[in-house]
């Protein structure tokens, strides 16, 4: 859970840093650059902590994707940037991509283990040895090296 918090903090720091960069370029104030340097550095530090347990592809997709989405919204509100139909389509596609990448990280269901310790592919096979052929024990369709 803490690694997801690190990822959230990385996203927030990236958003603040990038918006500070835009603010500095529009206003000419050095404060924006100073905030940008600290926030972007903090963002990478938090991201590096997050990827210890969060899959890199997922972490990076969320970090960049959510960052782009929120930065675009604030750029329209604060800096008067335009939001064309193509940009909106791109953002919708971005959201879909983030959801697909995130859903691809779900752990597969564990197979039923109540039938014994054999893998599911051989659970239904009989285990009676039917004979030996050239040093190989033949067990109902399975071949095992004879001891």
Curated annotation (Swiss-Prot):
Residues 105-117 have a biased composition (Basic residues). InterPro entries: Small_drug/metabolite_transptr, Small_multidrug_res, Spermidine_export_MdtJ. It holds the Pfam family Multi_Drug_Res. One of its GO terms (molecular function) is spermidine transmembrane transporter activity. The chain crosses the membrane at residues 1-21, 31-51, 54-74, 81-101. GO terms for biological process: glycine betaine transport. Catalyzes the excretion of spermidine. Belongs to the drug/metabolite transporter (DMT) superfamily. Small multidrug resistance (SMR) (TC 2.A.7.1) family. MdtJ subfamily. This is Spermidine export protein MdtJ. It comes from Yersinia pseudotuberculosis serotype IB (strain PB1/+). The lineage of its organism: Bacteria, Pseudomonadati, Pseudomonadota, Gammaproteobacteria, Enterobacterales. The gene is mdtJ.
């Amino acid at each position: 859970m803490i690694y997801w918090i690190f990822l959230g903090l990385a996203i927030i720091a990236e958003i603040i840093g990038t918006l500070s960069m835009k603010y500095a370029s529009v206003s000419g104030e050095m404060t924006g650059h100073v905030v940008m340097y600290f926030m972007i550095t903090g963002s990478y530090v938090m991201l590096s902590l997050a990827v210890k347990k969060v899959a890199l592809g997922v972490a990076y997709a969320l970090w960049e994707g959510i960052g782009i989405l929120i930065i675009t919204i604030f750029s329209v509100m604060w800096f008067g940037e335009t939001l064309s139909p193509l940009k909106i389509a791109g953002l919708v596609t971005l959201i879909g991509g983030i959801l697909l990448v995130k859903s691809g990280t779900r752990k597969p269901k564990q197979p039923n283990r109540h039938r014994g310790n054999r893998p599911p592919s051989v659970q239904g096979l009989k285990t009676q040895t039917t004979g030996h052929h050239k040093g190989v024990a033949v067990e109902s369709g399975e071949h095992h090296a004879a001891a």
